[in-house]
């Protein structure tokens, strides 16, 4: 992983002879030589940071680089917090499952859906059961009416390798006014 995108040129690293200089308080210094911009930054006890290297002339800002970097990291952390991670719970079944076992597994699936988690039902096909994958589809179709009130079937029962899979997601709650 390269750090090229995170690399910011500051102070003596800036090689442009002239730069458009902006102060940390928004003060416009105009187009000045790099050395003059460095002097202004040094007088204020701050850093000269290259903001727009592709502009003509390049734009530099006089600021506290440590503080700037801290605020950038803080923004990234805040953005990560706002992302929601979807958790998928998997419930395994077999073709020869009894109705009371289906009810038990559906009870757990309902609990997961109430917590906002996605549920993946998998029917494992053993040996000769692979010749009749529709038996696995039938098992999953028995489950659909038992969870319709709380979940939505996102992916209908379909064969994937030795499994017949079905994905159920929680229903969106209508906002009460």
Curated annotation (Swiss-Prot):
Q: Which UniProt keywords apply?
A: Cytoplasm, Initiation factor, Protein biosynthesis
Q: What family is this?
A: Belongs to the IF-3 family.
What's one Pfam family here? IF3_N
Main function: IF-3 binds to the 30S ribosomal subunit and shifts the equilibrium between 70S ribosomes and their 50S and 30S subunits in favor of the free subunits, thus enhancing the availability of 30S subunits on which protein synthesis initiation begins.
* One term of GO molecular function: ribosome binding
Q: How does it assemble?
A: Monomer.
Enumerate the InterPro entries for this protein.
Answer: T_IF-3_C_sf, T_IF-3_N_sf, Translation_initiation_fac3_CS, Translation_initiation_fac_3, Translation_initiation_fac_3_C, Translation_initiation_fac_3_N
Q: Does the keyword Cytoplasm apply?
A: yes
User: Gene symbol?
Assistant: infC
Taxonomic superkingdom: Bacteria
* UniProt-recorded name of the protein: Translation initiation factor IF-3
Q: Which Gene3D superfamilies match?
A: Translation initiation factor 3 (IF-3), C-terminal domain, Translation initiation factor 3 (IF-3), N-terminal domain
Where does the protein end up?
A: Cytoplasm
Q: Name one GO biological process term.
A: ribosome disassembly
């Amino acid at each position: 992983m390269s750090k090229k995108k995170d690399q910011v040129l500051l102070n003596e690293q800036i090689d442009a002879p002239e730069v458009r200089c902006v102060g940390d308080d928004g003060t416009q210094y105009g187009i000045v030589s790099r050395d003059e911009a460095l002097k202004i930054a040094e007088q204020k006890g701050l850093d000269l940071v290259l903001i727009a290297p592709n502009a003509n002339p390049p734009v530099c800002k006089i600021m506290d680089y440590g503080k700037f970097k801290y605020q950038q990291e803080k923004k990234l952390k805040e953005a990560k917090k706002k992302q929601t991670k979807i958790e998928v719970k998997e419930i395994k079944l077999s073709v020869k499952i009894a109705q009371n076992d289906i009810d038990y597994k559906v009870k757990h699936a309902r609990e997961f859906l109430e917590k906002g988690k996605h549920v993946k039902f998998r029917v494992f096909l053993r040996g000769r059961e692979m010749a009749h994958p529709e038996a696995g589809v039938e098992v999953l179709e028995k489950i659909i009416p038992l969870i319709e009130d709380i979940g939505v079937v996102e992916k209908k029962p379909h064969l994937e390798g030795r499994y017949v899979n079905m994905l159920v997601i929680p229903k969106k709650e209508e906002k009460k006014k």
